Amino acid sequence: VADIGLPRDATYWVGARATGSAAPGGATSASLTGQGQTLATIPGTTPVRVTTVVDLGATPRRLRPGVFLDDGLAVELAPGGRLRRLLDAAAQPGVSWAIDPALLAEVTDMADGYVLWAPPTSIPGTGVEAAKAWLAAYRALPAASGVQTLYGRPDLVGALGAGATAVLDRTQAATAASGLGLPVVAVATRVDAASLAALGRRSVAVVSPGVAATSPWALIGDAAVAGAETFEAPIRSPLIGDSPATRADVAVALARATGAQVRLVRTPDAAAI
């Protein structure tokens, strides 16, 4: 960097082109045979604060205590499954995590034995041991690195838009009844002015990929909001293409541009970035 006079603490396009000619001696004009480029971020002296939050949540599958719709949750909890891999990522040093108490209630129920709904009868579930192992690993997570989300993660934008103002009250009551004793943060895919105002009045902080990640925390209305990056969507630029490596390059470049970054990890692939 110093040799070519480029300042540090900046992001640059770096690429290479290969040209060639099939004619002896290069008698004809050379043509492009290949090219590649990527983003390269040169760190400065000021460290960039990056907070990684592993999101432990899943689509509900419990119909009533001890009865589940299917064994989809068992697949996610088993070794190599999405939730197992996310839990392993949450256990890494310096990583924060957020758990939906509704998920924890379902896994706890599974670990005690459960059946699958198969009218007019039921069949035994197969995920008891996977649930027990997952719970043991979850209980080993450092509590100081964790928060809990609102129970069941309701769509507050849709609920408040439909006039169902009691949804948030019921959700907060269920969250408190879970007894986890962790700080509460609303992890929401989408937010609007009404939902942020309602959460702000209840002093519930918000982490959302639906808010521009221009700073780690911002006050929007009365709510403390962290705009998060998920890096789940493919990179559609023809200049660099899409791969785990290019997503990592983009993540670093965005972090340098804003000075800080909250990464919300919801998939094992995103955990690798």
Segments and roles (model prediction):
Residues 139-156, 218-224:
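Short, compositionally biased "basic patch" segments
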Residues 85-95, 176-273:
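Catalytic grooves of carbohydrate-active enzymes
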Residues 147-177, 235-242:
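Glycine-rich phosphate-binding "P-loop"
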Residues 1-51:
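Extended acidic/polar, glycine-enriched regions
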Residues 63-65, 106-112, 158-161, 193-200, ...:
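A short acidic (Asp/Glu
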Residues 55-57, 99-102, 150-152, 188-190, ...:
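Active-site-proximal beta-strand/loop segments in catalytic clefts of secreted hydrolases
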Residues 30, 34-143:
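Active-site beta->alpha N-cap acidic-glycine motif
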Residues 12-17, 97, 149, 186, ...:
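Primarily hydrophobic membrane-targeting regions of prokaryotic envelope proteins
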